[in-house]
Amino acid sequence: MDKSSGELVTLTPNNNNTVQPVALMRLGVFVPTLKSLKNSKKNTLSRTDATEELTRLSLARAEGFDKVEITGPRLDMDNDFKTWVGIIHSFARHNVIGDKVELPFVEFAKLCGIPSSQSSRRLRERISPSLKRIAGTVISFSRTDEKHTREYITHLVQSAYYDTERDIVQLQADPRLFELYQFDRKVLLQLKAINALKRRESAQALYTFIESLPRDPAPISLARLRARLNLKSPVFSQNQTVRRAMEQLREIGYLDYTEIQRGRTKFFCIHYRRPRLKAPNDESKENPLQPSPAEKVSPEMAEKLALLEKLGITLDDLEKLFKSR
């Protein structure tokens, strides 16, 4: 629904864009590859609290689940995200029978953004590991009281089967999660920016997060962007990665921004977003935001902010704490 006009807007995926559930884009399910040799060799397990976003699903509401967690192997941007895009496209563009969809393997590879010129062996080497990681990602819904616990455990994709000789791919989804694939708070994600950011996974990850935000988003804290990337390096190194990724997004023409400071917290003010990487005919529709002037902070408040920073507590953490009360 377009809030300004009241018009119902249908979002349809094609080769240049895909409909992505907002929850998966904001939560950091898909993150950059760990570049450090020490970290990259670890069988890294990712654990994400998805309670705030996914308790809105009808499954959670009907069963009274009040906690949702996504657990599984670390899903990267360069291969796993593109495979997930192919899965979303497959269910959107092909006939779903029961809980399964079937399509030619070569077409599925194209939907994943893999050139058809690649050999069958190279296709398998890219798609097979990604399908295993995505199918190995667990979503658990639970509710616990003083005496009992209820829990429903499922997967991002229930099963995947492919046969390159017969040229088929079969994908199976949990019917109770179809709503996740067609989330009512979804956005149309342009793939043009993703393609312009090849091998720049941090910039790709921040793009999917920023593009999921509503129009005229509030300033985004540096800490929130660090959390979205879910890196394991020291904080100062993570800050450099975030700033470099934001600059890369500006270089391809996706956005413009200003970095500001309020107290001891750094923020990014997004002036505009251009997923097509070109200016619209009417630039006034972008509603550029002017950076807010830095607020004066009293010495007492500055001491409190400094203490929170030493403890590793961010303003986002405090906001979540107050919301949970």
Swiss-Prot record:
The keyword Iron-sulfur does not apply. Pfam families: Rep3_N. GO terms for biological process: DNA replication initiation; plasmid maintenance. It comes from the Bacteria. Residues 279-298 are annotated as: Disordered. InterPro entries: Initiator_Rep_WH1, WH-like_DNA-bd_sf. One of its GO terms (molecular function) is DNA-directed DNA polymerase activity. Gene3D superfamilies: Winged helix-like DNA-binding domain superfamily/Winged helix DNA-binding domain (1.10.10.10). Keywords: DNA replication, DNA-binding, Plasmid, Plasmid copy control. Belongs to the initiator RepB protein family. This protein is essential for plasmid replication; it is involved in copy control functions. In vitro, binds to the DNA repeat units, BCDD'D'', EFG and HIJ. This is RepFIB replication protein A. The gene is repA.
